[in-house]
Design a protein with these regions (language model features):
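Membrane-embedded catalytic scaffold of the fatty acid hydroxylase/desaturase
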Residues: 2-128
Length: 128
């Protein structure tokens, strides 16, 4: 079923993207490429689109390879692309909603804003 495929894509992509993102924060050579994304001073819905080309190629490339190798349907892929675009827009939006019931399993705007902040804990961990 389509819903199962979309859920599987979300899980595979989220796992992969999490580790790619952590790598951008942890590897000094890669950080300058990702730092472009963190250079936004006032978060708004377009902040998620502020990316260096190297960041885009590595993140999307490494995230999409397992999705394509696993052979999901075109409909499931299209649904995933829509969901991930909406989610990126939402977490970068100029709101600080916490969504307490789900904030431990889903990145919320409040958490992602903290991740982009200048606080030492946020800038040193950069886990979002």
């Amino acid at each position: 079923p389509l819903a199962v495929q979309v859920l599987a894509i979300v899980l595979v992509a989220d796992f992969t993207q999490y580790w790619v993102h952590r790598t951008f924060h942890a590897v000094p050579f890669l950080w300058p490429f990702h730092a472009i994304h963190h250079s936004v001073e006032d978060m708004d819905w377009l902040a998620g689109s502020r990316l260096h080309l190297v960041d885009v190629i590595l993140t999307r490339g490494l995230t999409y390879v397992p999705i394509f190798v696993l052979g999901f349907s075109q409909s499931a892929l299209m649904a995933y692309v829509f969901l991930v675009a909406a989610q990126a827009t939402f977490i970068h939006a100029n709101v600080r909603w916490e969504f307490r019931p789900i904030r431990r399993i889903v990145a919320t705007p409040a958490f992602h804003h903290w991740h982009h902040s200048a606080e030492t804990d946020a800038t040193m961990s950069r886990d979002a």
